[in-house]
Amino acid sequence: MNILKSLISLSLITFISRILGFMRDLLIAYSFGASGITDAFFLAFKIPNLFRRIFAEGAFSQVFIPILSEYKNNKNIELTRNFISNILGLMIIILSLFTAFGIYFANDIVKICAPGFINSHEKLYLATKMLKIMFPYIFFVSLGSLTGSILNAWNYFSVPAYSSIFLNLSMIMFISFVTAYFNPKILSLAWAVIVGGVFQILYQFPYLKNINMLIFPKFNILNLGVLKFLKQIGIVALGMSVNQVSIIIATISSSFLISGSISWIYYSDRLVEFISGIFGVSLSTILLPLLSKSVNNINIKEYSRLLNWALRLVCILVIPSIIILFTLSESLITLLFKYGAFTYNDVIMTKNVIEFYSIGLLPFVLIKILLAGFYSIRNVKTPMKISIFILVLTQLMNIFFIKYFQYTSFALAISLASWINFFLLYRKLCQSEFFIPSTNWLRFLLKIFAAAMVMLILLFINKNLILSANTHSIFFKILRLFYICASSGGGYLFTLFCLGLRFNHFYLKSYKY
């Protein structure tokens, strides 16, 4: 398998999905702005997404894929099918109970996550109503994660990536054509989430049938694979939930601040997740099955080679992205969201959050790579312990910063904590018997730093010359931003080329650790 080709393909699909996500957010911003009702929607939307990141994209896939990889490589097909069938049965039971619990206690969950809403009847009512509608999304997206993990184990990386497009398409269609039939109109978004969740899982069924893995559920908790899964899932879920608890605490704080705070944080998250999704999620998705295979084959050299390759590739790609995001944040937000009810004040408020998030964007992505390294060697306790420490540290910093930075305090706190998180994880992984760190990191980083400085100079020159011209044409705005990014990015790549870095160095077959 050509890993770099798979990564480019997966990143391109993720890019398309994120662009559709921006179109979705543009329509939301145009239709509803950044107000109390959008705060209610984004809170209600955030809660199932927090649990999705814990159960679906987080703990589940990190534990399930290494065990499935072991079955696929070392067991026969019937044992593998039986393991998947029992995991499916277990998930359906747990998710059904959890969904029923969430719907029944929706009002209490909203009050816990956003106590500031208690004083606003409209916000509380809308958030509760929309949460009841959207909570089943956890059920569908978690089952979609199961099917996606199976397909990833068979190297069908692009199929699960395409499934995320359905949520964005559903919301775009509902905003464009169905909103008028709802009162209040924003309720249409909640139903769009459910429709998108259903299509996310149905779309993958034909591909499961192609690999003979479209299986009916069973329930045997004594299955050896299931027992191994249950032994690890609790620890990983705890570690994954720590980050989400941190976000919930930040949401609680934001609910007491000026109206629109939750919305500004949401829109800034979208831009940050655009970069982390294209590079971090795509790379870790491909990396985890490959690392698990190298561990199952007791191939430490290949394991180290994969991790070192991924870490260096992240640095090459993410550092220039951070520079662009930080330097052009106001222009990007204006282009993406400043329409209709979304005002210039909303642009500035969102920009302030993005600038603090940019500080921690590189470790955000690097941590995803390191976690794949830990989970592939079945070390789930170390990331969990570190994440608990980081949770406490983040909240202490947030308490200190909120007095000075208000709604941007959490972005600053989590960015600084992410650097500490990265260094702790990297140090622990270097101490393991599996990972041999790459040499010449300092020389490599100095080359990137030099290229980044050239890029930054070009960005400022182009920004002052080109962005000073006022225009109301969206096409011209897109064109000039594309030119600024392309010319500055070209300078970055040319500098790296002059310093001796070549694209073919990152073909994995020729990469040396």
Swiss-Prot record:
Keywords assigned by UniProt, alphabetized: Cell inner membrane, Cell membrane, Cell shape, Cell wall biogenesis/degradation, Membrane, Peptidoglycan synthesis, Transmembrane, Transmembrane helix, Transport
GO cellular component, one term: plasma membrane
Location in the cell: Cell inner membrane
Transmembrane segments: 3-23, 25-45, 83-103, 133-153, 162-182, 186-206, 221-241, 245-265, 271-291, 313-333, 354-374, 382-402, 405-425, 441-461, 481-501
BP terms from Gene Ontology: cell wall organization; lipid translocation; peptidoglycan biosynthetic process; regulation of cell shape
One Pfam family of this chain: MurJ
UniProt pathway: Cell wall biogenesis; peptidoglycan biosynthesis
Paired cysteines (S-S): none
UniProt membrane topology term: Multi-pass membrane protein
InterPro entries associated with the record: Lipid_II_flippase_MurJ/MviN, MurJ
Gene Ontology terms for molecular function: lipid-linked peptidoglycan transporter activity
Function: Involved in peptidoglycan biosynthesis. Transports lipid-linked peptidoglycan precursors from the inner to the outer leaflet of the cytoplasmic membrane.
Family, similarity comment: Belongs to the MurJ/MviN family.
PANTHER family linked: LIPID II FLIPPASE MURJ
Protein name: Probable lipid II flippase MurJ
